[in-house]
C-alpha cells in the first residue's frame, strides 16, 4: 500500500521544481544580452551588420510575415533622417518601412524583407551580369532614384550594397541615412557617401548639386554591373580619388556595347552640367523597353500621390478595413496612423496585411481549398466510372448533361438542405443484368436522396462524394419534375379502356405539342425485386407492383386500343431491370409524404419540362403519369397542413408543371385540353373561364402564382363557378377521365363553403344577364361570411334519391317569384345559384311541369355542388354529364312537384 504522506511530499517537490525552472528561465531571459522578441516581432537570426548597427530576420506574429529588423543607437544623427524620409516613400522599387520601435537605448526599424540579398553579392556570384538583366535592373534603380528626386530628396549614398533584390529579382533601394531634402538649384556642402562612388565635386570638396552626384553614382553602378569591376578603384584611397578627378574609365568593346558606352560616358561626365537628367536616362536606347515602362509607371504613381486621397480607395483596402472592423479593430485609429505616417504598431499591422493581400491577388495560380479540389476529383472519377461498360451512343447525351454541372452551384451557400447519394455501381449476374440509364433519373422535384441505391456502394463513402454525386445527377436531370416509373402500365391501360377507374395518365398538351405516353418498365412475375424503385411520395399514393403475367403483346394491344402509341424501343427485355434511387424527404416531419412531392420541381430554375432520352439516344415521350385521385388541386397538397406553414418548399411554381386533365365534350370526337399559354380556357360544355380552371390552381395553394404565402384571400373570392354533373346516367362517359375523391389528403386552412355563397356576385351577374334570376344579394358582404357550419348546410340542402353519391338540392320552398323560363341554346345548360345571404332567387320554371288547378308553376329544383377546390365531401367529377339535372327534376315530379318533399 502506498504511503499517502510520502506521495504528498513527492507531489510538492515536483511542483517546486516546475516553479523553479520557470523562474530560472524568466531570469535568464532578463539577464541575457541576446534578444528574442521586439514588440510584435520574434527575432529569428542575424543577417547583417554594419557601422550603423545590426540587421535581424524577424517574424511578425499577427500576420506571420517576415521582416528585417534594423537596429541603431538612439544617439545616431542619421537614424532620425532615415526614418523621417524613408516613411515618405511609397514606391515598388523602394523598400517599405512598416514600423519603428523606440526603446531606451535603441531604435528598431521593421523594413521589407528581400530574400535576394544585396546586388553586390549577386554580382560577386555571377562576376558579370548580362546586358539584358543589366538594362532591367538599372531601369528599376533609376526609377527609384527618379521617384526620390521627384519628392525633392537626394540619396547621396547610392551603391551596390544599398540595393537589395526581392524573391522575384527586382531591385529595391534602401538605406536613406544620408538622404536630405534638396530643392532645385540648391547647393550642398556635406561630404558623404563611399569614396569609389563619389563624384569629382565631392572629392574636391566643392559645393555640389545633390541630384547630379546621384547621377554620377548611377554611372558607376552601371559600369560595374556590365564589366564586373569598379571604374575607379585602387588599393590606395588617394589614388582612387585622383583617378575619379582626372582619368576616364576604360571601355572594353567586347564587353560594353556602343549604346551602353554612350550612356555610361554621359553619366560619368566630369562636368556636372553635362550629366543627363533621370528622365533622359530612362529614355536612353540602352534601357529600352524597360526604361520607358518604369518612367511611365513612376509618373503615374507620383500623379496619384500628389492628387491625394490614394489611401483606402482600392477594393483590397476597403475589404481589409471591413474585415478589421468586423474583428473589433479600431479602423479609424489605423487610418489616422497611416495618413499621419506614424509608423507605429497599427501602421505596421495595416501595411503587412495589405502586402499579404496583394500577394494573394498577384498569385499566378489562385489557391483552392482541399475540399474544392477533392470534390473536383470525385466528379471526374465518378464520371469515369459511370461510363465504363456503356456504349458511346448511350453515353453521348448523358455526358453532355453531366459536364454542365458547375462547381459553383455545388458549393452554393444558398443551399438549405443536405443531400447524400452514393454513386451507382453495376453488378452482372448470370440470369439478369442491371442496366442503368444515365438520363433515367429525371426526378428534380425531390431535395434529398436516400443512402441506399441498388448496387454496391463505393468504399470511400464520404460526404463530398455524396454531394458531388447528387449534384451531378441533379444537373443531368434538371427537368420533368413528376417523372415516375409505373409497373402496372398494362393494368391501367386496359382498365381505362373499359371505363373503370385506374391510375392511367392524362394526355398533356404543353405549348401545342402533345407528349406521347411511354412505357418504361415491363412487369416480370418471376421476380420479387422491383423493376424501378418507386417514389413513395409522388402523386399522393404508392403505385402497386403489377402481379399479372402480362406479355409485351398485351401491352402493345392495350396501348393501341385507347390511341396511345407505345415506343417499341422502350419495351425492354424482361431480363433487364431499371433501378432508380429511392427518394426520401428530410425537410419536414409535420406534413404528410403525399403533400411533399406533389408539386413537382422544387427548384425554380429546373421547372421547365423536357423529354427524357432513351437508350438509343433518341428523345422519347414522358412516362405515363398517375391520374390525380381528386379534382382537388395537386398544388394544394404542397401546403403543409396550413398555408401558414413555413417549412414548405420555397420554390416558385409554374402553371405548366401541373397535370392538366383533358375533358371530353359530349357529342364531340375532339378533346378539349388546357394549355398553359392561353388565358381563356374552354371546358367540355363550351363555357369559357377566364384565367383559371376548375381547381387546377388551388384556392389554398401556397405555391400558386395567384396566391401569396401570407393571408391571401384572392382564391377565396375567385372560386370557380359551379356546374352540376352526374355520372350515373351517362353510359358513354369515359371513366378513365373521371376524378375520384382523394382520401387522406390534408384540409386547407379556409372554412367550408356553403351553398349560399358566391364569389362577389360574379355568378349572379352572369346569370342575371341571361335572365335566369334577379340579383338581390349584396356584393359588398364580407368574404369571411362564406365560412359557415355544417348545420346550416343541413337546413338548406335536401338529398335526391338514387344510388351513388348524394346530390345536394337547394330548398326553395317559399322562395318562388315570378320569372321567365329561359334556357341556353342547347336547352339544358342550367347554373347553380350562389348568394351571400338568404335565398332570394328567381327559379326556373318548366313548361311541362305545371299545376293546372292552381295555375302555379312547379319549381324545377336546381341541383348544385360546391367548389371542388376545397376538398369537400360533396366533390364529384367535373366531367359528369347533364343528365343529373333531368334526373333530379323527374324525381321531384314523381314526388308531386314539391321540391321539399
UniProtKB/Swiss-Prot annotation:
Q: Which UniProt keywords apply?
A: ATP-binding, Kinase, Nucleotide-binding, Phosphoprotein, Serine/threonine-protein kinase, Transferase
Q: Where is the composition biased (Low complexity)?
A: 588-599
Mark the residues carrying the PTM Phosphoserine.
Answer: 456, 533
**Region described as Disordered: spans on this chain:** 500-530, 588-629, 745-770
Database matches in InterPro entries: Aur-like (IPR030616), Kinase-like_dom_sf (IPR011009), Prot_kinase_dom (IPR000719), Ser/Thr_kinase_AS (IPR008271)
Q: EC number(s) for this protein?
A: 2.7.11.1
Active site located where?
157 (proton acceptor)
What's one GO MF term for it?
protein serine/threonine kinase activity
Q: Where is the composition biased (Basic residues)?
A: 759-770
UniProt catalytic activity: L-seryl-[protein] + ATP = O-phospho-L-seryl-[protein] + ADP + H(+); L-threonyl-[protein] + ATP = O-phospho-L-threonyl-[protein] + ADP + H(+)
Q: Where is the composition biased (Polar residues)?
A: 600-613
Gene3D superfamilies in the cross-refs? Transferase(Phosphotransferase) domain 1 (1.10.510.10)
Name the GO cellular-component terms: cytoplasmic ribonucleoprotein granule
Annotated Pfam families: Pkinase (PF00069)
- Which residues are listed for ATP binding in this entry? 47-55, 70
Q: Does the keyword Mitochondrion apply?
A: no
What residues does the Protein kinase domain cover?
A: 41-287
Q: What induces it?
A: By methyl methanesulfonate (MMS).
Chain segments annotated as coiled-coil in the UniProt record: none
Top EC class, one word: transferase
Q: What does this protein do?
A: Putative serine/threonine-protein kinase.
User: What family does the entry list?
Assistant: Belongs to the protein kinase superfamily. Ser/Thr protein kinase family.
Q: Which PANTHER family match?
A: SERINE/THREONINE-PROTEIN KINASE IAL-RELATED (PTHR24350)
What is the official name of this protein in its record?
Putative serine/threonine-protein kinase YPL150W
Record the organism.
Saccharomyces cerevisiae (strain ATCC 204508 / S288c)
Amino acid at each position: 500500500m502506498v504511503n499517502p504522506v510520502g506521495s504528498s511530499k513527492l507531489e510538492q517537490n515536483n511542483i517546486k521544481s516546475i516553479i523553479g525552472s520557470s523562474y530560472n528561465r524568466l531570469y535568464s531571459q532578463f539577464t541575457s544580452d541576446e534578444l528574442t522578441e521586439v514588440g510584435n516581432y520574434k527575432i529569428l537570426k542575424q543577417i547583417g551588420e554594419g557601422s550603423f548597427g545590426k540587421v535581424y530576420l524577424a517574424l511578425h506574429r499577427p500576420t506571420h510575415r517576415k521582416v528585417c529588423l534594423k537596429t541603431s543607437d538612439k544617439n545616431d544623427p542619421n537614424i532620425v533622417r532615415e526614418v523621417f524620409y524613408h516613411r515618405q516613400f511609397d514606391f515598388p522599387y523602394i523598400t517599405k518601412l512598416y514600423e519603428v520601435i523606440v526603446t531606451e537605448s535603441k531604435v528598431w526599424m521593421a523594413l521589407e524583407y528581400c530574400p535576394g540579398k544585396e546586388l553586390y553579392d549577386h554580382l560577386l556570384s555571377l562576376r558579370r551580369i548580362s546586358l539584358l538583366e543589366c538594362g532591367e535592373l538599372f531601369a528599376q534603380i533609376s526609377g527609384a532614384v527618379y521617384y526620390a528626386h521627384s519628392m525633392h530628396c537626394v540619396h547621396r549614398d547610392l551603391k551596390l550594397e544599398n540595393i537589395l533584390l526581392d524573391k522575384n529579382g527586382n531591385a529595391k533601394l534602401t538605406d536613406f541615412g544620408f538622404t536630405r531634402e534638396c530643392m532645385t538649384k540648391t547647393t550642398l556642402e556635406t561630404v558623404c557617401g563611399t569614396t569609389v562612388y563619389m563624384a569629382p565635386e565631392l572629392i574636391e570638396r566643392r559645393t555640389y548639386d545633390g541630384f547630379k552626384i546621384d547621377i554620377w553614382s548611377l554611372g558607376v553602378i552601371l559600369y560595374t554591373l556590365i564589366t564586373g569591376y569598379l571604374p575607379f578603384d585602387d588599393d590606395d584611397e588617394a589614388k582612387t580619388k585622383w583617378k575619379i578627378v582626372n582619368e576616364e574609365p576604360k571601355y572594353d568593346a567586347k564587353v560594353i556595347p556602343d549604346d551602353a558606352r554612350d550612356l555610361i560616358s554621359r553619366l560619368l561626365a566630369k562636368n556636372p552640367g553635362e550629366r543627363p537628367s533621370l528622365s533622359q536616362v530612362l529614355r536612353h536606347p540602352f534601357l529600352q523597353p524597360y526604361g520607358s515602362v518604369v518612367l511611365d509607371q513612376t509618373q503615374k504613381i507620383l500623379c496619384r500621390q500628389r492628387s491625394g486621397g490614394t489611401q483606402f480607395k482600392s477594393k483590397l483596402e476597403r475589404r481589409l478595413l471591413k474585415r478589421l472592423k468586423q474583428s473589433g479593430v479600431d479602423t479609424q485609429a489605423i487610418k489616422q496612423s497611416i495618413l499621419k505616417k506614424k509608423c507605429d504598431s497599427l501602421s505596421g499591422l495595416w501595411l503587412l496585411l495589405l502586402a499579404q493581400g496583394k500577394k494573394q491577388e498577384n498569385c499566378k495560380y489562385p489557391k483552392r481549398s482541399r475540399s474544392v479540389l477533392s470534390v473536383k476529383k470525385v466528379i471526374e472519377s465518378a464520371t469515369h466510372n459511370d461510363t465504363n461498360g456503356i456504349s458511346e451512343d448511350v453515353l453521348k447525351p448523358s455526358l453532355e448533361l453531366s459536364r454542365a454541372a458547375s462547381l459553383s452551384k455545388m458549393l452554393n451557400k444558398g443551399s438549405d438542405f443536405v443531400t447524400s447519394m452514393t454513386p451507382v455501381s453495376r453488378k452482372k449476374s448470370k440470369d439478369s443484368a442491371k442496366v442503368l440509364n444515365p438520363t433515367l433519373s429525371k426526378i428534380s422535384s425531390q431535395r434529398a436522396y436516400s443512402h441506399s441505391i441498388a448496387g454496391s456502394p463505393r468504399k470511400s463513402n464520404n460526404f463530398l462524394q455524396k454531394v458531388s454525386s447528387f449534384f451531378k445527377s441533379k444537373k443531368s436531370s434538371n427537368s420533368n419534375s413528376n417523372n415516375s416509373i409505373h409497373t402496372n402500365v398494362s393494368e391501367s391501360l386496359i382498365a381505362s379502356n373499359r371505363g373503370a377507374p385506374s391510375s392511367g395518365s392524362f394526355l398533356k398538351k404543353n405549348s401545342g405539342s402533345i407528349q406521347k405516353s411511354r412505357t418504361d418498365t415491363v412487369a416480370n412475375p418471376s421476380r420479387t425485386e422491383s423493376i424501378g424503385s418507386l417514389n413513395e411520395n409522388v402523386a399522393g399514393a404508392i403505385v402497386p407492383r403489377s402481379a399479372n403475367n402480362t406479355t409485351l403483346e398485351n401491352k402493345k394491344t392495350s396501348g393501341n386500343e385507347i390511341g396511345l402509341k407505345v415506343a417499341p424501343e422502350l419495351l425492354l427485355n424482361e431480363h433487364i431491370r431499371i433501378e432508380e434511387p429511392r427518394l426520401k424527404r428530410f425537410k419536414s416531419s409535420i406534413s404528410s409524404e403525399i403533400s411533399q412531392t406533389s408539386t413537382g420541381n422544387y427548384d425554380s430554375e429546373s421547372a421547365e419540362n423536357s423529354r427524357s432520352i432513351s437508350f438509343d439516344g433518341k428523345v422519347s415521350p414522358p412516362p405515363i403519369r398517375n391520374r390525380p385521385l381528386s379534382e382537388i388541386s395537386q398544388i394544394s397538397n404542397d401546403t403543409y397542413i396550413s398555408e401558414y406553414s413555413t417549412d414548405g418548399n420555397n420554390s416558385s411554381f409554374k402553371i405548366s408543371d401541373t397535370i392538366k386533365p383533358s375533358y371530353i365534350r359530349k357529342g364531340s370526337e375532339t378533346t378539349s385540353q388546357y394549355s398553359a399559354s392561353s388565358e381563356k380556357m374552354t371546358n367540355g360544355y363550351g363555357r369559357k373561364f377566364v384565367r383559371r380552371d376548375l381547381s387546377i390552381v388551388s384556392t389554398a395553394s401556397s405555391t400558386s402564382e395567384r396566391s401569396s404565402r401570407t393571408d391571401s384571400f384572392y382564391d377565396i373570392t375567385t372560386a370557380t363557378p359551379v356546374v352540376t354533373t352526374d355520372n350515373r346516367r351517362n353510359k358513354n362517359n369515359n371513366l378513365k377521365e373521371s376524378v375520384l375523391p382523394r382520401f387522406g389528403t390534408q384540409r386547407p386552412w379556409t372554412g367550408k363553403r356553403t351553398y349560399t355563397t358566391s364569389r362577389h356576385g360574379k355568378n349572379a351577374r352572369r346569370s342575371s344577364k341571361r335572365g335566369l334570376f334577379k340579383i338581390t344579394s349584396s356584393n359588398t358582404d364580407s368574404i369571411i361570411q362564406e365560412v359557415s357550419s355544417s348545420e346550416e348546410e343541413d337546413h338548406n340542402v335536401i338529398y335526391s334519391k338514387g344510388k351513388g353519391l348524394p346530390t345536394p338540392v337547394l330548398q326553395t320552398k317559399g322562395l318562388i317569384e315570378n320569372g321567365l323560363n329561359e334556357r341556353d341554346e342547347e336547352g339544358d345548360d342550367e347554373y347553380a345559384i350562389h348568394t351571400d345571404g338568404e335565398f332570394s332567387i328567381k327559379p326556373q320554371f318548366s313548361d311541362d311541369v305545371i299545376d293546372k288547378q292552381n295555375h302555379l308553376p312547379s319549381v324545377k329544383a336546381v341541383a348544385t355542388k360546391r367548389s371542388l377546390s376545397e376538398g369537400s365531401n360533396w366533390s364529384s367529377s367535373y366531367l359528369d354529364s347533364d343528365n343529373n339535372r333531368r334526373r333530379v327534376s323527374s324525381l321531384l315530379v314523381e314526388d308531386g312537384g314539391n321540391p321539399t318533399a
